Design a protein with these regions (language model features):
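Positively charged n-region of N-terminal signal peptides that target proteins for export
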Residues: 2-13
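Intrinsic disorder/low-complexity segments
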Residues: 6, 18-19, 27
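Sec-dependent N-terminal signal peptides
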Residues: 13-23
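Boundary at the C-terminal end of the N-terminal hydrophobic targeting segment
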Residues: 26-28, 34
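Short amphipathic beta-strand starts and helix->beta connectors
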Residues: 33-37, 81-84
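Short beta-strand segments of immunoglobulin-like
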Residues: 38-42
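Non-catalytic cap/lid and distal C-terminal segments of serine-dependent acyl enzymes
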Residues: 43-263
Length: 263
């Protein structure tokens, strides 16, 4: 049996290829951008804040954060003040919502959601900070000292992650160093401020959670701080560097590190 080859004009092939490409892009955008965006957190003009989460199948949704009144938390080491918790109310299309009853004072705040007992991040807020093994979303209410935490239109310093050899500990280690604007070309000598984190922290703690570079940039620009070098070390003598930055790979962060008090 013989088969006759059918000729398909090139313009039809090109048209079909373009059509399929457009359909693919359209479906991809629909998957990425499908539905109305959920705005969260929404900071209102009076500094009240609305938190939203789309969870149509959830039974209970709560928000927990340091902007809420504290609650007592029992631990093996006794009772401590922990972040408060507030309930969200379900609205249209399965979007849950909570608005703070009072305006929030200027500050950097952290929070997360609890959905049916499971703690999750706010998918509408890409800004997050790790504190030891905890990850939370963050937002800033501007004004007062909180403006120091922002990136403002001022000269900016440089943040470097530097590896050095420690003969005492027998390993290479990592530190974070802030140098003020103009440091590289000034030819001047600068005072050095050594900044150590708290228990469980590392060389990333102050620069991320503590907003060191933003605060120094702003204070120096305002003439309220002398230009200086800030060295942020890793005080855990058993660590080369922060979790995920060592040759051990992406190990889980821990508070109970060996040699913690020898750093």
């Amino acid at each position: 049996m013989f088969y006759k080859e059918k000729y398909i004009p090139m313009r039809k092939i090109v048209f079909f290829s373009v059509f399929m490409l457009v359909c693919t892009i359209a479906f991809a955008q629909q998957a990425l951008w499908g539905g109305a965006p959920v705005v969260s957190p929404e900071i209102h003009d009076n500094n009240t804040v609305t938190f939203r989460l789309k969870a149509p199948k959830a039974v209970q949704v709560q928000v927990t954060g340091d902007f809420l009144p504290t609650q007592k938390i029992k631990t093996p080491f006794g009772e401590f003040d922990g972040p408060g918790v507030a309930d969200l109310k379900e609205g249209k299309e399965g979007v849950w919502e909570f608005t703070t009853p009072e305006p929030l004072k200027p500050e950097l705040y952290s929070y997360s959601f609890i959905v049916d007992g499971l703690k999750i991040m706010d998918p509408s807020n890409v800004y997050m900070i790790r504190d030891v093994a905890s990850v939370t979303n963050v937002f800033i209410i501007g004004g007062g000292r909180a403006d120091l935490y922002k990136v403002n239109d001022v000269p900016h310093g440089t943040v470097s992650r530097i590896w050095y050899n420690s003969p005492t500990l027998g390993m290479n280690r990592r530190m974070t160093v802030y140098t003020p604007a103009g440091y590289e070309t000034s030819g001047k000598r600068y005072p050095v401020f050594y900044l150590l984190h708290g228990m469980g922290g590392d060389e990333e703690a102050w620069i991320a959670l503590g907003r060191t570079s933003q605060i120094l940039d702003n204070l120096i620009a305002q003439g309220k701080a002398e230009p200086m070098i800030v060295v942020m070390t890793n005080g855990n003598a058993s660590q080369e560097a922060a979790p995920g930055e060592t040759h051990y790979g992406m190990v889980p962060p821990s508070m109970n590190l060996p040699k913690t008090m020898e750093g």
